[in-house]
Amino acid sequence: MGEIKLIVGLANPGAEYAQTRHNAGAWYVEELARICGVSLVPDSKYFGLTARAVLHGKDVRLLIPTTYMNLSGKAVGALANFFRITPEEILVAHDELDMPPGVAKFKLGGGHGGHNGLKDIIAKLANDKNFYRLRIGIGHPGDKNKVSGYVLGKAPAKEQELINAAVDEAVRSTEVLFKEDMVKAMTRLHSFKAE
């Protein structure tokens, strides 16, 4: 694999969405920025909050789009084009309905699984699905008609603790990714489950 040069955390903008399950990807990028000692600042050129960080001597751009979720590709495309970053050098963190809270996994490629943020990113990357994802489990409401309200709702305290623990472990695994490689990062993260 090429090195990861752009890490994106998917979210909806604004205080009313900040603590909703759909913003789990942003929580991960915020924590990554914190441990790297950098601040995410608004940049209208890239339609989001951005920072330049260094992880184990390697440069990486951090991005949280401030478009709405279904327009995330606008931000990702703008930054990737400007810095000539290819899809396989991008890691997109997002909430994942098909995994329980307390679990997170890396993945290369695949479809969008109905996730509007991923759907728009794939479209804006000329239908190239070959980017990395960090899937952060939020669980499923059990009824597909309840999904929208579920992802835009806040998790109960115990579930939130589990999601936060998985996000923290994902950040530590990202350090392994930059220090070692994706295989070691996957091995570490995929054996983790918060209880």
UniProtKB/Swiss-Prot annotation:
Statement: the UniProt record of this protein carries the keyword RNA-binding: yes
Gene Ontology cellular component terms for the protein in this record: cytoplasm
Gene Ontology terms for molecular function: peptidyl-tRNA hydrolase activity; tRNA binding
Secretion signal, residue range per the UniProt entry: none
Coiled coil: none
Residues annotated as site: Discriminates between blocked and unblocked aminoacyl-tRNA: 12
Listed PANTHER family: PEPTIDYL-TRNA HYDROLASE
Family from the record: Belongs to the PTH family.
Protein name: Peptidyl-tRNA hydrolase
